[in-house]
Design a protein with these regions (language model features):
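Generic structural signal for well-ordered, non-membrane alpha-helical segments
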Residues: 13-21, 60, 112, 116, ...
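Buried hydrophobic positions in well-ordered alpha/beta secondary-structure cores of metabolic enzymes
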Residues: 24, 123, 182-184
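Extracellular/luminal Protease-associated
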Residues: 87-134
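Acidic, glycine-rich flexible loop/linker segments
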Residues: 153-229
Length: 243
């Protein structure tokens, strides 16, 4: 598994998630886009069901550790526990983001406040910096003070008995398919995933794209006519007016 330098992570944290998506797959005809996925047919970024609870933290980037939570099963429960999840977090390259797919009956899905201050503090002890989940969690104010990012399907105050169903398997959360070890980049706009070995190219191309956009924005903000706006966008991601 690719282990990235601290410098790469530092650069990734300077870049917003939409720019990362632009480079990963959004604009396949742009030479700066790596085209890692078909942008419409593959599930590589999250949808509107995921809410960022602490946008003030800025971009959060880490290696994915995955697990599935659901109702206790008398034929299986007890084989895995949250301690096994912590072991998986500890074994992964750092930093990590825990990606939890919650599988509950419909009547419970919006009421399972899975993680709270105790779980999050335990996760942080083994190098985890954020959690992404399709279901709710809780202890929002306490976790705000920990500078740990929550990307969730919602918030609720309680839960009943829960069980770990699997660890480090492919999961689907908020419309995004995630495999263990993939890199997750997330901020108030949502989350995107990509293979970790592409990170240096993602950083390089994202920086170039931001520089290009900054140059174009200067021209656009000075523009007074549609022709001037069109000229500023020439060669960029947006389609030019047909002759």
């Amino acid at each position: 598994m690719t282990e990235l330098s601290d410098d790469i992570f530092a650069e990734l944290r300077k870049i917003d998630t939409p720019t990362i998506t632009n480079v990963v797959a959004t604009y396949p005809k742009n030479p700066l886009c790596l085209g890692l996925y078909n942008p419409w047919t593959e599930n590589w970024y999250t949808d509107t069901s995921i809410r960022c609870l602490y946008p003030e933290l800025g971009p959060t980037v880490g290696y994915a550790v995955t697990c599935v939570y659901g109702m206790p099963d008398p034929n299986y429960s007890g084989r895995l526990s949250f301690m096994d999840v912590l072991d998986a977090l500890e074994a992964m390259k750092k930093p990590t983001i825990l990606v939890i797919q919650q599988k509950w009956p419909d009547e419970i899905m919006k009421k399972a406040g899975l993680a709270g201050e105790m779980m999050v503090s335990s996760m942080m002890a083994v190098g985890c910096i954020g959690m992404l989940s399709n279901g709710p969690s809780r202890d929002v104010d306490a976790i705000r003070k920990l500078k740990f990012q929550y990307m969730l399907g919602g918030v609720t105050a309680g839960h009943g008995e829960m069980a770990v169903q699997s660890i480090n398997v492919p999961v689907s959360v908020g419309g995004m398919d995630v495999a263990p070890g993939e890199l997750i980049h997330m901020d108030e706009n949502g989350a995107v995933k990509f293979p970790a070995h592409h990170a240096p190219a993602v950083v390089k191309n994202a920086q170039a794209m931001l520089d290009d956009e900054a140059r174009r924005l200067v021209m656009i903000r000075k523009a007074k006519t549609a022709a001037e706006v069109r000229a500023a966008n020439s060669g960029g991601a947006y389609t030019q007016k047909k002759a």
